[in-house]
Design a protein with these regions (language model features):
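A solvent-exposed, charged loop/short amphipathic helix patch at secondary-structure junctions
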Residues: 53, 110-119
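Sec-dependent N-terminal signal peptides
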Residues: 3-14
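Residues that line or immediately flank small-molecule/substrate-binding pockets and catalytic motifs
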Residues: 8, 93-96, 150
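C-terminal/domain-edge helix-coil "capping" segments
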Residues: 20-23, 101-102, 116-176
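Sec/Tat signal peptide C-region and signal peptidase I cleavage site
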Residues: 14-20
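Short, solvent-exposed beta-strand-terminating loops
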Residues: 95-108
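N-terminal segment of the mature soluble domain
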Residues: 23-25, 31-98
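Short, hinge-like loop/turn segments at secondary-structure boundaries
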Residues: 75, 108-110
Length: 176
């Protein structure tokens, strides 16, 4: 009985945490190693967020090609974002290619996270599943994190298709 109560308490805290996000706008940053993967991810994710009523600005629109992601926390960029009323950063990265991954236990500040290198590409030929990690930051502090696991993704096209199918459900939860 104690275990059941404890599980319900944990579930309730996660659902309350998800409800507090109230996502209306986002600066989207795909933390991927290869530039073509970053472009593919940001364009597709921006499209999905826009279709679901979230004001989105991909980092590709703010940075010059090859620029460091840490530039996104510079004063000049923050001023531009404030003028556009964008207050939430969303860092998206590939956590891994199997179903065993958990949320990161140690997530630092926005500046620290932007400087971390992520080595996984968006897609590899031999994978069957992929896990994405979504980290939301407001005022340079982590305010929410969540994993999205996609199964049976044997091609890049299937991966994008499944992302278009599953992500809108999460976005609706994040908007609530």
């Amino acid at each position: 009985m104690k275990k059941l109560f404890f599980c319900l308490l944990i579930f309730a805290s996660f659902s309350l945490n998800a409800q507090r996000l109230k996502l209306t706008n986002v600066v989207l940053v795909a933390q991927l190693d290869r530039s073509e993967d970053k472009f593919t991810a940001e364009i597709n994710l921006a499209e999905i967020f826009a279709e679901n009523g979230v004001n989105v600005l991909p980092s590709l629109n703010l940075l010059k090609q090859g620029a460091s992601l840490s530039t996104l926390v510079s004063d000049s960029i923050k001023t531009i974002l404030k003028e556009k009323q964008l207050d939430t950063y969303l860092l998206v990265n590939v956590r891994g290619y199997d179903r065993q991954f958990r949320l990161s236990s140690k997530i630092g500040s926005l500046t620290e996270e932007l400087n971390i290198a992520h080595m996984f590409p968006l897609f590899r030929d031999e994978i069957t599943s992929i896990t994405f990690e979504f980290n939301f930051f407001r005022n340079d502090k982590l305010c929410h994190t969540e994993l999205l696991k996609l199964k049976n993704v044997s091609t890049k096209e299937k991966l994008i298709q499944k992302l278009h199918k599953k992500l809108p459900r999460l976005i609706q939860r994040w908007k609530a």
